[in-house]
A protein has these predicted regions:
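Cytoplasmic-side transmembrane-helix entry/capping segments in multi-pass membrane proteins
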Residues: 42-52, 98-109, 128, 151-161, ...
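Specific transmembrane alpha-helical segments of multi-pass solute transporters/efflux pumps
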Residues: 1-2, 27-75, 79, 87, ...
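Transmembrane alpha-helices of multi-pass small-molecule transport proteins
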Residues: 7-58, 85, 137-141, 158-176, ...
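Juxtamembrane helix-entry segments on the extracytoplasmic side of multipass membrane proteins
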Residues: 8-16, 40-46, 113, 118-137, ...
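Hydrophobic residues within alpha-helical transmembrane segments
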Residues: 17-21, 50, 54, 81, ...
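Helix-helix packing/entry segments at the starts of transmembrane helices
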Residues: 15-17, 60, 74-83, 144-165, ...
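Hydrophobic/aromatic residues within transmembrane alpha-helices
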Residues: 5, 14, 18, 66, ...
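Hydrophobic transmembrane alpha-helices of multi-pass small-molecule transport proteins
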Residues: 26, 89, 93, 98-118, ...
Length: 263
Protein backbone atom coordinates (compact mmCIF):
# COMPACT_ATOMS: atom_id res chain seq x y z
CA UNK A 1 0.00 0.00 0.00
CA UNK A 2 2.86 2.39 0.80
CA UNK A 3 4.27 1.70 -2.68
CA UNK A 4 0.97 2.90 -4.16
CA UNK A 5 0.91 6.00 -1.94
CA UNK A 6 4.42 6.96 -3.07
CA UNK A 7 2.96 7.75 -6.50
CA UNK A 8 1.36 10.90 -5.05
CA UNK A 9 3.20 11.50 -1.76
CA UNK A 10 6.94 12.14 -1.24
CA UNK A 11 8.97 9.86 1.09
CA UNK A 12 9.44 12.40 3.91
CA UNK A 13 5.81 13.53 3.78
CA UNK A 14 4.55 9.95 3.66
CA UNK A 15 6.76 8.88 6.57
CA UNK A 16 5.43 11.80 8.59
CA UNK A 17 1.79 11.06 7.79
CA UNK A 18 2.19 7.34 8.52
CA UNK A 19 3.61 8.01 11.96
CA UNK A 20 1.11 10.75 12.76
CA UNK A 21 -1.63 8.30 11.78
CA UNK A 22 -0.06 5.77 14.11
CA UNK A 23 -0.10 8.30 16.95
CA UNK A 24 -3.75 9.14 16.32
CA UNK A 25 -4.67 5.45 16.43
CA UNK A 26 -3.13 4.76 19.85
CA UNK A 27 -3.76 8.15 21.48
CA UNK A 28 -6.97 7.01 23.27
CA UNK A 29 -4.92 4.29 25.00
CA UNK A 30 -1.99 6.55 25.95
CA UNK A 31 -3.47 8.53 28.85
CA UNK A 32 -3.20 5.94 31.58
CA UNK A 33 -0.60 3.62 33.06
CA UNK A 34 3.17 3.77 33.07
CA UNK A 35 5.49 4.81 35.88
CA UNK A 36 5.84 8.57 36.50
CA UNK A 37 8.93 7.89 38.61
CA UNK A 38 10.68 5.95 35.84
CA UNK A 39 9.62 8.52 33.24
CA UNK A 40 11.68 11.09 35.16
CA UNK A 41 14.75 8.88 34.83
CA UNK A 42 17.22 10.52 32.45
CA UNK A 43 18.42 7.21 31.02
CA UNK A 44 14.85 6.15 30.17
CA UNK A 45 14.17 9.42 28.37
CA UNK A 46 17.46 9.23 26.50
CA UNK A 47 16.74 5.70 25.25
CA UNK A 48 13.26 6.73 24.14
CA UNK A 49 14.62 9.80 22.34
CA UNK A 50 17.16 7.65 20.47
CA UNK A 51 14.40 5.18 19.57
CA UNK A 52 12.36 8.05 18.11
CA UNK A 53 15.32 9.28 16.05
CA UNK A 54 16.39 5.89 14.69
CA UNK A 55 13.08 4.06 14.49
CA UNK A 56 10.69 6.92 13.82
CA UNK A 57 12.64 9.51 11.84
CA UNK A 58 15.43 7.73 9.95
CA UNK A 59 14.14 4.17 9.43
CA UNK A 60 10.85 4.94 7.65
CA UNK A 61 12.39 7.52 5.31
CA UNK A 62 15.19 5.15 4.28
CA UNK A 63 12.64 2.39 3.68
CA UNK A 64 10.39 4.59 1.54
CA UNK A 65 13.30 5.78 -0.61
CA UNK A 66 14.20 2.12 -1.12
CA UNK A 67 10.57 1.23 -1.83
CA UNK A 68 10.36 3.94 -4.47
CA UNK A 69 13.29 2.36 -6.32
CA UNK A 70 12.45 -1.36 -6.08
CA UNK A 71 9.46 -3.74 -6.31
CA UNK A 72 7.39 -4.00 -3.14
CA UNK A 73 7.93 -7.79 -2.99
CA UNK A 74 11.72 -7.37 -3.02
CA UNK A 75 11.59 -4.69 -0.33
CA UNK A 76 9.37 -6.94 1.80
CA UNK A 77 11.96 -9.70 1.58
CA UNK A 78 14.83 -7.34 2.41
CA UNK A 79 12.97 -6.45 5.60
CA UNK A 80 13.98 -9.88 6.93
CA UNK A 81 17.35 -8.23 7.56
CA UNK A 82 15.76 -6.44 10.52
CA UNK A 83 15.44 -9.72 12.39
CA UNK A 84 19.12 -10.50 11.94
CA UNK A 85 20.28 -6.99 12.78
CA UNK A 86 18.12 -6.90 15.91
CA UNK A 87 19.66 -10.15 17.16
CA UNK A 88 23.23 -9.02 16.39
CA UNK A 89 22.73 -5.65 18.07
CA UNK A 90 21.06 -7.33 21.05
CA UNK A 91 24.20 -9.46 21.41
CA UNK A 92 26.75 -6.72 20.73
CA UNK A 93 25.30 -3.88 22.77
CA UNK A 94 22.68 -5.36 25.08
CA UNK A 95 24.33 -8.69 26.04
CA UNK A 96 21.61 -11.06 24.83
CA UNK A 97 22.58 -14.60 23.86
CA UNK A 98 23.85 -15.25 20.31
CA UNK A 99 24.64 -18.84 19.32
CA UNK A 100 26.18 -20.52 16.28
CA UNK A 101 22.84 -21.24 14.63
CA UNK A 102 21.91 -17.58 14.77
CA UNK A 103 25.18 -16.66 13.05
CA UNK A 104 24.50 -19.19 10.28
CA UNK A 105 20.95 -17.88 10.00
CA UNK A 106 22.27 -14.35 9.63
CA UNK A 107 24.53 -15.48 6.80
CA UNK A 108 21.57 -17.12 5.02
CA UNK A 109 19.44 -13.98 5.31
CA UNK A 110 22.25 -11.77 4.03
CA UNK A 111 22.87 -14.20 1.15
CA UNK A 112 19.20 -13.94 0.23
CA UNK A 113 19.46 -10.17 0.26
CA UNK A 114 22.46 -10.23 -2.07
CA UNK A 115 20.70 -12.64 -4.43
CA UNK A 116 17.72 -10.31 -4.54
CA UNK A 117 19.77 -7.20 -5.32
CA UNK A 118 22.11 -8.66 -7.95
CA UNK A 119 19.77 -8.93 -10.99
CA UNK A 120 18.80 -5.23 -10.83
CA UNK A 121 22.39 -4.01 -11.00
CA UNK A 122 23.37 -0.69 -9.42
CA UNK A 123 19.74 0.31 -8.81
CA UNK A 124 19.13 -2.93 -6.95
CA UNK A 125 22.19 -2.46 -4.76
CA UNK A 126 21.16 1.11 -3.92
CA UNK A 127 17.62 0.07 -3.02
CA UNK A 128 18.91 -2.89 -1.00
CA UNK A 129 21.35 -0.69 0.92
CA UNK A 130 18.61 1.82 1.74
CA UNK A 131 16.38 -0.94 3.13
CA UNK A 132 19.33 -2.49 4.99
CA UNK A 133 20.13 0.86 6.62
CA UNK A 134 16.45 1.19 7.58
CA UNK A 135 16.69 -2.25 9.20
CA UNK A 136 19.77 -1.17 11.19
CA UNK A 137 17.82 1.84 12.44
CA UNK A 138 14.90 -0.38 13.42
CA UNK A 139 17.23 -2.91 15.03
CA UNK A 140 18.53 -0.16 17.30
CA UNK A 141 14.98 1.02 17.89
CA UNK A 142 13.82 -2.50 18.82
CA UNK A 143 16.55 -2.95 21.42
CA UNK A 144 16.21 0.54 22.88
CA UNK A 145 12.43 0.30 23.10
CA UNK A 146 12.60 -3.06 24.88
CA UNK A 147 14.52 -1.32 27.68
CA UNK A 148 12.10 1.59 28.09
CA UNK A 149 9.98 0.53 31.05
CA UNK A 150 8.58 3.82 32.36
CA UNK A 151 6.06 4.18 29.54
CA UNK A 152 3.25 1.92 28.42
CA UNK A 153 3.43 0.59 24.82
CA UNK A 154 0.66 3.01 23.82
CA UNK A 155 2.52 5.95 25.34
CA UNK A 156 5.78 4.98 23.64
CA UNK A 157 4.02 4.58 20.30
CA UNK A 158 2.25 7.93 20.65
CA UNK A 159 5.50 9.70 21.52
CA UNK A 160 7.26 8.10 18.56
CA UNK A 161 4.41 8.93 16.23
CA UNK A 162 4.03 12.56 17.24
CA UNK A 163 7.77 13.27 17.46
CA UNK A 164 8.93 11.48 14.31
CA UNK A 165 5.78 12.27 12.35
CA UNK A 166 6.05 15.99 12.99
CA UNK A 167 9.75 16.12 12.08
CA UNK A 168 9.41 14.15 8.85
CA UNK A 169 6.25 15.97 7.77
CA UNK A 170 7.95 19.33 8.32
CA UNK A 171 10.93 18.22 6.24
CA UNK A 172 8.58 16.92 3.56
CA UNK A 173 6.65 20.19 3.38
CA UNK A 174 9.92 22.09 2.83
CA UNK A 175 11.63 19.68 0.41
CA UNK A 176 8.70 18.05 -1.40
CA UNK A 177 6.46 21.00 -2.18
CA UNK A 178 3.55 21.08 0.21
CA UNK A 179 0.78 18.68 1.18
CA UNK A 180 -0.38 15.92 -1.20
CA UNK A 181 -4.04 15.50 -2.30
CA UNK A 182 -6.58 14.70 0.41
CA UNK A 183 -6.87 11.14 -0.87
CA UNK A 184 -3.16 10.63 -0.24
CA UNK A 185 -3.34 12.24 3.21
CA UNK A 186 -6.31 10.16 4.36
CA UNK A 187 -4.87 6.98 2.88
CA UNK A 188 -1.53 7.50 4.63
CA UNK A 189 -3.20 8.27 7.97
CA UNK A 190 -5.38 5.15 7.70
CA UNK A 191 -2.41 2.92 6.85
CA UNK A 192 -0.43 4.54 9.65
CA UNK A 193 -3.15 3.87 12.21
CA UNK A 194 -3.16 0.13 11.48
CA UNK A 195 0.32 -0.70 10.22
CA UNK A 196 2.27 1.66 12.46
CA UNK A 197 0.10 2.61 15.45
CA UNK A 198 -1.47 -0.68 16.48
CA UNK A 199 1.40 -2.71 15.02
CA UNK A 200 4.09 -0.82 16.96
CA UNK A 201 2.04 -0.80 20.17
CA UNK A 202 1.54 -4.57 20.04
CA UNK A 203 5.19 -5.15 19.08
CA UNK A 204 6.42 -3.06 22.02
CA UNK A 205 4.18 -5.04 24.38
CA UNK A 206 5.82 -8.23 23.13
CA UNK A 207 9.35 -6.81 23.17
CA UNK A 208 9.07 -5.68 26.78
CA UNK A 209 7.87 -9.13 27.86
CA UNK A 210 9.90 -11.41 25.57
CA UNK A 211 13.04 -9.38 24.78
CA UNK A 212 13.92 -7.66 21.52
CA UNK A 213 15.33 -10.61 19.60
CA UNK A 214 12.56 -13.11 20.49
CA UNK A 215 9.77 -10.71 19.67
CA UNK A 216 11.49 -9.77 16.42
CA UNK A 217 11.55 -13.43 15.41
CA UNK A 218 7.77 -13.61 15.73
CA UNK A 219 7.46 -10.34 13.85
CA UNK A 220 9.62 -11.77 11.06
CA UNK A 221 6.65 -13.48 9.42
CA UNK A 222 5.34 -10.11 8.17
CA UNK A 223 7.80 -9.69 5.24
CA UNK A 224 6.58 -12.93 3.68
CA UNK A 225 2.98 -11.74 3.98
CA UNK A 226 4.07 -8.53 2.26
CA UNK A 227 5.48 -10.54 -0.64
CA UNK A 228 2.20 -12.41 -1.11
CA UNK A 229 0.22 -9.16 -1.04
CA UNK A 230 2.54 -7.59 -3.63
CA UNK A 231 2.13 -10.60 -5.93
CA UNK A 232 -1.56 -11.38 -5.59
CA UNK A 233 -3.22 -8.08 -4.65
CA UNK A 234 -1.07 -5.57 -6.53
CA UNK A 235 -0.08 -7.71 -9.49
CA UNK A 236 3.71 -7.48 -9.23
CA UNK A 237 5.45 -10.19 -11.28
CA UNK A 238 7.23 -12.86 -9.28
CA UNK A 239 10.88 -13.40 -10.22
CA UNK A 240 13.31 -16.28 -9.84
CA UNK A 241 15.54 -14.09 -7.66
CA UNK A 242 12.64 -13.44 -5.29
CA UNK A 243 11.88 -17.16 -4.98
CA UNK A 244 15.56 -17.91 -4.36
CA UNK A 245 15.91 -15.12 -1.82
CA UNK A 246 12.73 -16.22 -0.05
CA UNK A 247 14.20 -19.72 0.25
CA UNK A 248 17.47 -18.48 1.78
CA UNK A 249 15.72 -16.05 4.10
CA UNK A 250 13.00 -18.48 5.13
CA UNK A 251 15.66 -21.06 6.01
CA UNK A 252 17.57 -18.45 8.00
CA UNK A 253 14.53 -17.29 9.95
CA UNK A 254 13.49 -20.90 10.64
CA UNK A 255 17.00 -21.66 11.92
CA UNK A 256 16.86 -18.64 14.23
CA UNK A 257 13.48 -19.75 15.55
CA UNK A 258 14.90 -23.22 16.24
CA UNK A 259 17.96 -21.79 17.96
CA UNK A 260 15.88 -19.49 20.17
CA UNK A 261 13.46 -22.28 21.08
CA UNK A 262 16.24 -24.62 22.15
CA UNK A 263 18.01 -21.90 24.10
Amino acid sequence: VAKTLLASVGPFTLAGLLYLGGALGVLPFAFRGGSPQLRRDRRQRRMLALAVVFGGCLGPVLLLFGLRAAPAASVSLWLNTETVVTAILAWGFFHEHLDRRTVIAAALVFAGGLLLAAPAGAAGWRAGMLVALACVCWGLDNNLTALVSGFTPAQTTAIKGIGAGTVNLAIGLVLEGGLPPWSGILGALAVGTLSYGFSIMLYISGAQQLGASRSQLLFSTSPFLGVLLAWFMFGEPATAAQFGAAGFMGAGIALMLTARHEH
